[in-house]
Amino acid sequence: EKKDEKIQRRQKPKVEIKKEEPKSDVVLASKRVTLDNKGIGKVKNVELSPTIDNAMVERGAALFKTNCTACHKTNKRFVGPNPTGIMERRSPEWIMNMILDPKLMTEEDQCAKDLLVEFNGASMANQNLTEEQARDILEYFRTLK
């Protein structure tokens, strides 16, 4: 009998494996598609030509590198969202309004508010860019796919 007791004592206790709760259907703000939302701000309408303007892209890429890469990376999630594919998720107006007045957007636009929460309250700094500069960055974003 003692031998049987030893075997029983040496047996590993049964571990109850908890099943993971199914993940909710909530889509992260950075992945959400809101093309009908123009955001809050002075940009009401942006006309995009069917072709990419390479001069604008060059200027936009330079502006992005200088003003945005401390928080945004085009190849990964960082302090702020990755702008790659942004044109498939946000309207041109929303993007420009976010670039031009991130404070107003995070105060009044629900998607921008949700992004602020998703990125742990890291507010986007206002770079005090002109509309023309924001439009150049937008053109650069059109090339990020």
Where are these regions (language model features)?
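Short, low-complexity, disordered segments immediately C-terminal to signal peptides
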Residues: K2-K18
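Electrostatic cytochrome c docking/interface patches
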Residues: K14-L63
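Sequence context of c-type cytochrome heme-c attachment sites
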Residues: K44, K73, D114-L115
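Gly/Gly-Pro-rich "capping" loops immediately C-terminal to redox-active cysteine motifs
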Residues: V57, K73-D101
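The canonical Cys-X-X-Cys-His
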Residues: G60, F64-N75, I95, M124, ...
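Axial heme c-ligation environment in periplasmic c-type cytochrome domains
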Residues: V79-I86, L104-Q133
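Inter-heme linker and motif-flanking segments adjacent to c-type heme-binding CXXCH motifs
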Residues: T143-K145
